[in-house]
């Protein structure tokens, strides 16, 4: 962290930067000052898809690890997003991981009473086939949100990121995410010394991506992992 890095915490000493923190993400967010975060990532553990699709294999086989994670209902997700809206800087970005169920059924109500605007989306091709009653799941979706005022110039500095991203990942967590994609997005939307936030860190891929981006500062937590 360089000398110009902004102090973002209301109370210092509760959380460590550039490392794992085992803590409730809402507690972490409540200790962060308004308009201090350049870029945030949010990957909720969706209860909705398990309730609606009812594959019948909850707690069985490869689904055990996923279902053992703390689930988030819609009200919890909305609370997180409102807090993220509060701490993100004007024209800063929130990268929201979303599954096909919520992409198709709708998620814009989560953004009500915020200053967050949908500006783009990336499809992550995971390179392997998952579950599905009809088509088999092979991708996830990253909704790109920008806090008002919306602008690209000066706020998005890389122009080599395609809207379909191929990257296989090592399964170190039920919600493992592509480190290189996240690294590129961090480089595109932050300057040296700025903060990258992930309040539901899971396998801490955003931490790894931030460290690889260099000269950025990670702050994040997970309720189960730290």
Please place each PLM-identified region on the residue numbering:
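Core catalytic lobe of class I
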Residues: 1-221, 225
């Amino acid at each position: 962290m360089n000398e110009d890095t902004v102090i973002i915490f209301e109370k210092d000493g509760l959380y460590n930067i550039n490392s794992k923190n085992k803590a409730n993400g809402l507690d972490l967010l409540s200790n962060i000052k308004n308009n201090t975060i350049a870029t945030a990532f949010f990957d909720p553990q969706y209860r909705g898809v398990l309730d609606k699709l009812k594959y019948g294999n909850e707690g069985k086989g490869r689904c055990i690890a996923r279902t053992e994670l703390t689930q988030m209902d819609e009200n919890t997700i909305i609370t997180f997003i409102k807090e993220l809206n509060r701490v993100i800087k004007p024209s800063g970005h929130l990268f929201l991981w979303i599954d096909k169920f919520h992409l198709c059924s709708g998620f814009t109500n989560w953004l009500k009473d915020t200053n967050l605007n949908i500006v783009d989306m990336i499809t992550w091709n995971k390179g392997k086939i998952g579950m599905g009653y009809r088509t088999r799941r092979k991708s996830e979706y990253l909704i790109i949100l920008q806090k008002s005022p919306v602008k690209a110039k000066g706020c998005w500095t890389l122009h080599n990121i395609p809207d379909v991203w191929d990257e296989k990942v090592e399964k170190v967590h039920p919600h493992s995410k592509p480190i290189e994609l996240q690294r590129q997005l961090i480089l595109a939307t932050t300057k040296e010394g700025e903060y990258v936030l992930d309040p539901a860190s899971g396998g801490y891929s955003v931490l790894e991506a931030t460290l690889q981006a260099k000269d950025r500062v990670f702050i994040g937590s997970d309720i189960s992992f730290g």
